[in-house]
A protein has these predicted regions:
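Basic, Lys/Arg- and aromatic-enriched nucleic-acid-binding interface segment
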Residues: 1-28
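Short, basic (Lys/Arg/His-rich) helix/loop patches that form interaction surfaces
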Residues: 5-7, 112-165, 172
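Short, cationic motifs built from Arg/Lys/His that form the positively charged side of catalytic pockets
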Residues: 13, 26-29, 59, 64, ...
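A short, basic/aromatic helix-end/turn motif that makes direct DNA contacts
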Residues: 33-44, 154-157, 164-171, 178-181
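C-terminal catalytic core of Y-nucleophile DNA break-rejoin enzymes
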Residues: 58-78, 92-117
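Conserved hydrophobic/aromatic "anchor" residues
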Residues: 78-79, 150
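DNA/chromatin major-groove-contacting recognition/catalytic segments
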Residues: 165, 177-196
Length: 196
């Protein structure tokens, strides 16, 4: 998505969606417009210590705040700049992920389609560069895969409670079961063939 956006600004939205889903461990529904929730730029906020947050409506209609890492800021600013160049009415009340034609935010189905197009572009690029085996993972990737990948990469460096809160898990046990125990199974599998 990064390469596509660097060469064609129409892919800025794809890059933003992919970065948000992976980095903030979002469910696709948390970026989508629903009858009871319209994700908007005003849902980004800063606390008194200067920490960045994003307010989302998650599973079970529960509102939660997700910590926004500094590394995501360039992607946010890049997409804001693009959106401002496309719409003179762009502002804090604008949809977080807007349609190219029409008004308002996007549905989960529309977001999935955009991400899939990004995966398809990545797949073709990787194949063209000779990374055929690695490219196969993108053929099977989903929006939820981005959430899982982001969380799996971060689980070793963040407290379990913080991960559970950002993931929107009601229980740390869920986070432990999905990310820690599965990591231990993988560790055991990779460790079986060690030599004495």
């Amino acid at each position: 998505a990064q390469t596509a956006a660097d060469t064609d600004q129409t892919h800025e939205r794809t890059l933003f969606i992919v970065a948000m889903l992976k980095t903030l461990y979002l469910r696709v529904s948390e970026l989508s417009e629903r009858p009871n929730w319209q994700p908007a730029w005003k849902h980004f906020w800063q606390d008194s210590d200067g920490n960045q947050w994003l307010k989302v409506l998650g599973k079970g209609n529960k509102i939660r705040d997700i910590s926004v890492p500094s590394a995501l800021s360039p992607y946010i600013q890049r997409y804001q700049k693009y959106r401002a160049s496309q719409s003179p009415n762009f502002g804090v009340n604008s949809a977080l992920v807007a349609k190219n034609r029409g008004t308002g935010g996007m549905t989960s189905r529309q977001l999935r389609r955009i991400v899939q197009q990004g995966f398809d572009l990545g797949y073709e690029k990787m194949r063209a560069e000779g990374f055929t085996d690695e490219a196969k993972a993108l053929r099977e990737a989903t929006t939820h895969w981005l959430r899982h990948t982001g969380a799996s990469q971060d689980i070793a460096t963040r407290p379990l409670k913080h991960m559970a809160d950002d993931l929107g898990h009601a229980s740390m046990g869920t986070t432990d079961q999905v990310y820690i125990q599965s990591d231990m199974k993988e560790r055991a599998r990779s460790g079986k063939s060690r030599e004495v």
